[in-house]
């Protein structure tokens, strides 16, 4: 027997949480890329 939740609030909460997690993941990736760019510029600047 499968128990399913017929509650729309739970489903909406899960969708909101999923969207929130994807936004946070995207921000993390963007932050990592920006950090790498800064590290590369600092490395180039200090080696000149």
Swiss-Prot record:
In the adult, expressed in Purkinje cells in the cerebellum, in motor neurons and interneurons in the spinal cord and in neurons of the cortex, hippocampus and thalamus (at protein level). Also detected in the developing cortex, hippocampus and thalamus at embryonic day E15.5 (at protein level). The chain crosses the membrane at residues 24-44. Its main location: endoplasmic reticulum. Keywords: Endoplasmic reticulum, Membrane, Transmembrane, Transmembrane helix. It is found in: Endoplasmic reticulum membrane; Extracellular vesicle membrane. It is a single-pass membrane protein. Residues 1-20 are annotated as: Disordered. One of its GO terms (biological process) is regulation of cytosolic calcium ion concentration. InterPro entries: TUNAR (IPR054138). One of its GO terms (cellular component) is endoplasmic reticulum membrane. It comes from the Eukaryota. In neurons, plays a role in the regulation of intracellular Ca(2+), possibly by acting as an activator of ATP2A2/SERCA2, thus increasing the efficiency with which Ca(2+) is removed from the cytoplasm. Inhibits differentiation of embryonic stem cells into neurons and inhibits neurite outgrowth, likely as a result of its role in intracellular Ca(2+) regulation. In pancreatic beta cells, lowers Ca(2+) levels in the endoplasmic reticulum and enhances glucose-stimulated insulin secretion. This is Protein TUNAR. The gene is Tunar.
């Amino acid at each position: 027997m499968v128990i399913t939740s017929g509650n729309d609030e739970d489903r909406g909460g899960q969708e909101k949480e999923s969207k929130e997690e994807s936004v946070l993941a995207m921000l993390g990736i963007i932050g990592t890329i920006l950090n790498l760019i800064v590290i590369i510029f600092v490395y180039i600047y200090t080696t000149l």
